[in-house]
């Protein structure tokens, strides 16, 4: 009877979900292929930088993942959002977050919501080395960074404004508000809560991930002695509500590693990732005896059961170097793998096709979610701004898709045409007094003080 109870418990832990082609086949890596460096998305230059450090010898895993993050935060080779200061929050603030975990003892250091300090991964490393804490946030994190010798940097607002102004002129779409008034899908605020009786059934909002426009990257290093480190770096979701902390800084959400079993990197919609801690779940699935392929698939299905709108990917690596991945909501999820065989470095970009998530969601929640609207100019004739919204309804297992087209008024189109002129006006004012600026005086923002932090990097 005792044996049966244990078997039943184990079966519950390892119960596979419905079969689907969510993951790439597991790649068994011979010991001679180690060390191993894996990074999310197709940023080969950053992976190469990390790999150069890792192959210098054993016990270089920590320095390797840090070097990968440093390359991304100091260059534009990991996309505009990470290196180009193009992911402001809704108030125009630029902040970074980063995290580092040691698989030997689960030591963890992270920062979030930190403005004015470029070297976010370096500050996260200092949190791990010099404090008993795991996560520091906001202005206090910046003060800690300065105390550790990191310098604040001033950055021009030009790049930020290039992203922020079109968003403001487009009625702040998309944003992260719900159940507020005025309606969040047609306004910039200021918002206040809707009375409970007026709140509608929750609509899931999808946030597509554009190729090359990723706001988070993760690195995982495994050496020949079995040491694991993982690190993550993020500029945060564009137009997020100020004060929001993302998955890159939360233990188990974006990264996790344990020398005894393996590690994982997760990326995608951070607010969903933080609710499920997929990197931690994947590592615990390895501990329970699952393969990297089945672990990645099971975790991805768990997310999709509750969040049909999820976009993102997950890479899982065993302590022996076997790796696999799963993804949802993307045309393709790519990650870079570097290793060594017979003294020669080998690097490849893995790309997996994601299953249509509507085929996966058979027992999950029902309801509606909307693809973020895209604004395009009609070709030929008079310029008319067209807003196309794809509405997908899941009811009783039957999918239906509706397309709605809304032709905006001419005055909205005229505002868009004048955008460049307004932007020049803003920049000229910034050149004269690069401190606080109230954009609403120019008619470019909602009727509340719009404040740019003075310190940018």
From Swiss-Prot:
Keyword set includes Phosphoprotein: no
Annotated keywords: Disulfide bond, Signal
Disulfide bonds: 72-78, 172-188, 327-354
Domain of life: Eukaryota
Pfam families found in the cross-reference section: Asparaginase_2
GO molecular function, one term: N4-(beta-N-acetylglucosaminyl)-L-asparaginase activity
InterPro entries: Ntn_hydrolases_N, Peptidase_T2
Coiled-coil segments on the chain, per record: none
GO cellular component: a single term: lysosome
Secretion signal, residue range per the UniProt entry: 1-20
Family recorded in the similarity comment: Belongs to the Ntn-hydrolase family.
Name the record gives this protein: L-asparaginase-like protein GL17509
Taxon lineage: Eukaryota, Metazoa, Ecdysozoa, Arthropoda, Hexapoda
């Amino acid at each position: 009877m005792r044996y049966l109870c244990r078997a039943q418990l184990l079966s519950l832990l390892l119960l596979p979900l419905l079969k689907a082609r969510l993951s790439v086949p597991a790649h068994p890596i011979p010991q001679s292929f180690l060390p191993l460096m894996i990074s999310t998305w197709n940023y080969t230059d950053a992976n190469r930088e990390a790999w150069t450090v890792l192959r210098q010898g054993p016990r270089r895993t920590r320095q390797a993942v840090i070097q990968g993050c440093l390359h991304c935060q100091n260059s534009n080779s990991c996309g505009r959002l990470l290196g180009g200061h193009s992911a402001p929050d809704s108030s125009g603030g630029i902040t970074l977050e980063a995290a580092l975990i040691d698989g030997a003892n689960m030591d963890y250091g992270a920062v979030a919501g930190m403005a004015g300090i470029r070297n976010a991964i370096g500050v996260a490393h200092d949190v791990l080395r010099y404090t008993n804490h795991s996560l520091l946030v906001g202005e206090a994190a910046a003060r800690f960074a300065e105390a550790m010798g990191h310098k604040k940097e001033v950055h021009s607002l030009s790049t930020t404004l290039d992203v922020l102004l079109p968003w403001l002129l487009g009625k702040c779409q998309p944003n992260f508000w719900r159940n507020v008034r005025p309606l969040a899908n047609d306004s910039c605020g200021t918002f206040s809560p809707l009375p409970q009786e007026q709140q509608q059934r929750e609509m899931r909002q999808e946030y597509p991930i554009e190729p090359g426009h990723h706001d988070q990257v993760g690195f995982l290093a495994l050496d020949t002695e079995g040491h694991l480190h993982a690190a993550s770096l993020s500029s945060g979701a564009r137009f997020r509500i100020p004060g929001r902390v993302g998955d890159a800084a939360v233990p188990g959400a974006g990264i996790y590693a344990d020398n005894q079993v393996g590690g994982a990197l997760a990326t995608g919609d951070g607010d969903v990732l933080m609710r499920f801690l997929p990197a931690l779940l994947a590592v615990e699935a390895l501990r329970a005896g699952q393969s990297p392929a089945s672990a990645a698939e099971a975790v991805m299905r768990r997310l999709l059961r509750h969040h049909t709108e999820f976009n993102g990917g997950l890479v899982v690596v065993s302590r022996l170097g076997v790796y696999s991945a799963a993804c949802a909501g993307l045309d393709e999820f790519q990650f870079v793998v570097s290793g060594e065989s017979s003294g020669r470095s080998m690097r490849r970009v893995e790309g997996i096709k994601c299953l249509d998530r509507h085929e996966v969601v058979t027992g999950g929640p029902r309801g509606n979610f909307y693809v973020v609207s895209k604004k395009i100019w009609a070709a030929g004739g008079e310029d008319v701004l067209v807003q196309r919204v794809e509405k997908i309804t899941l009811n009783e297992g039957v999918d239906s898709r509706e397309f709605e087209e809304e032709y905006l008024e001419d005055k909205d189109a005229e505002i868009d045409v004048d955008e460049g002129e307004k932007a020049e006006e803003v920049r000229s004012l910034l050149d004269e007094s690069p401190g606080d600026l109230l954009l609403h005086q120019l008619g470019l923002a909602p009727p509340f003080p719009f404040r740019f932090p003075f310190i940018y990097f």
